[in-house]
């Protein structure tokens, strides 16, 4: 005889042995089918029973690799949800719109709920949005509430839609398991703007202005009494091949009837623009026992994140297109000692009345792009903690009556320090030093 397997979406599959006889098979409805059950504000409901517009997805297996922010996992996956990355900076956040914007003046950001805790959309330094603090490897599912029914659960905060994130948890009776997941990615610039090389620029000036012109004499630099032309590719100087790494260690198991899951993660993402960098370290703990004959479900979760973001001077990208390609990146000429050896367009600096600075950079001239990057130190460090206790009690004797309680805390803070050297072409002589700090404390119950 042959063994037949009969299955259908939303039902439990069956295997039966067939030896030529007629079969009458009835499939049992599955209560564990993810496509049939969605997480909403007050618990879990069958998708067929929902009257509002709800989309539920699991992270796509095709997205395996380095995914830095949670918003990258839903980009292009849910109808009516538009995710636009704010910039190419490592660890950058994104603008999320559900069915477009609804206000010209007020915020159009959707409410983000992580394991039952509604998050404040106000970011801190180095932490672009609440999704940045969640390790993508810890996410079990996304549920998006799109229409006005979301306000019935979350009030006016849900008027722009709601994104509910459920993180992974332990399973009752599971054996202790330790797992590791790591990935590496290589990023390169896709293309650069086409500009003249140093040789082409020299030929252009020679053809249209002549070798005796001031424009021709301004090309290159004087070395040993001779005019020397360089062939500097400024775009190549400021961009790099970026390596990124992601490592995660997870411990899952169950102590008697108390399942748990703990994880730590480390992400390092280099930016294509030199010196830009993003480092994030996360830790999470989920304990989810069921008590009183499974009538009382407890979910205790805690998440911590530390992030360090190094911002490069984005103005260097424009400067790389406008800087003279016949000039060197650095020079041993003592005139440029005050500029760290980087070539700059100079003028008499008598206005400073400082004998140590006989020359300064011409204000209207293009600054050395590499100097703009190397002479600026812009670092943001942020910490975030989210803790939540969720209790769901099904009243004995009344299976349709549930009591739900949620209490949580969202504590985060970030500080950004910016320092620009006096040798920089953007803040010559004076330099710059400053910092900005933002702390956030929210208690929800």
What are these regions (language model features)?
Residues 110-111, 118, 325, 334, ...:
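Proline-rich low-complexity regions
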Residues 193, 272-284, 295, 301-305, ...:
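Small-side-chain secondary-structure face that scaffolds active or pore-lining regions
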Residues 200-206, 288, 321-326, 425-431:
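Short alpha-helical linear motifs
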Residues 1-305, 313, 357, 386-387:
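Short, small/polar-rich motifs associated with maturation and membrane association
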Residues 160, 286, 366-368, 445:
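Asparagine-centered polar/low-complexity signal
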Residues 43, 355, 408-411:
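Short glycine-enriched loops at secondary-structure junctions
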Residues 305, 310-384:
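Acidic/polar loop-and-plug regions of large Gram-negative outer-membrane beta-barrel proteins
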């Amino acid at each position: 005889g042959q063994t037949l397997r009969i299955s259908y979406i939303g039902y439990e599959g069956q295997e039966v042995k067939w030896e030529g006889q007629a079969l009458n098979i009835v499939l049992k409805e599955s209560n564990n089918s993810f496509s049939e059950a969605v997480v909403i504000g007050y618990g879990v409901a069958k998708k067929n029973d929902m009257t509002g517009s709800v989309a539920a997805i699991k992270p796509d297996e095709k997205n395996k690799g380095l995914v830095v922010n949670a918003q990258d996992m839903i980009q292009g996956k849910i109808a009516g949800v538009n995710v636009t990355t704010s910039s190419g900076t490592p660890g950058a956040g994104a603008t999320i719109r559900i069915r477009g914007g609804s206000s010209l003046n007020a915020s159009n950001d959707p409410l983000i709920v992580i394991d039952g805790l509604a998050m404040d959309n106000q970011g801190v330094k180095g932490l672009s949005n609440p999704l940045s603090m969640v390790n993508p490897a810890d996410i079990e599912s996304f549920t998006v509430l799109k229409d006005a029914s979301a306000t019935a659960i979350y009030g006016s905060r849900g008027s722009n839609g709601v994104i509910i994130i459920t993180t992974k948890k332990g399973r009752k009776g599971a054996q202790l398991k330790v797992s590791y997941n790591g990935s590496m990615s290589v990023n390169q610039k896709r293309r650069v703007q086409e500009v003249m090389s140093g040789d082409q620029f020299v030929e252009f000036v020679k053809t249209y202005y002549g070798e005796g012109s001031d424009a021709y004499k301004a090309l290159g630099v004087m070395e040993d009494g001779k005019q020397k032309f360089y062939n500097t590719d400024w775009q190549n100087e400021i961009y790099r091949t970026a390596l990124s790494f992601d490592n995660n260690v997870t411990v899952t198991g169950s102590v008697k009837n108390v399942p748990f899951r703990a994880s730590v993660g480390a992400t390092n993402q280099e930016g294509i623009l030199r010196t830009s960098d993003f480092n994030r370290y996360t830790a999470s703990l989920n304990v989810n026992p069921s008590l009183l004959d499974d009538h009382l479900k407890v979910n205790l979760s805690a998440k911590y994140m530390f992030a360090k973001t190094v911002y490069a001077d984005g103005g260097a990208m424009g400067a790389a297109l406008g800087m003279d390609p016949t000039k060197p990146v650095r020079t041993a000429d003592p005139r440029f000692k005050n500029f760290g050896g980087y070539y700059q367009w100079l003028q008499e600096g008598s206005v400073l009345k400082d004998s140590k600075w006989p020359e300064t950079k011409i204000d209207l001239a293009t600054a050395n792009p590499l100097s703009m990057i190397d002479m600026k130190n812009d670092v943001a460090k942020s910490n975030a903690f989210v803790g939540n206790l969720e209790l769901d009690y099904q009243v004995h004797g009344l299976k349709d009556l549930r009591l739900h309680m949620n209490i949580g805390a969202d504590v985060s803070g970030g500080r950004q320090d910016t320092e620009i050297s006096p040798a920089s072409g953007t803040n010559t002589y004076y330099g710059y030093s400053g910092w900005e700090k933002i702390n956030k404390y929210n208690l929800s119950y």
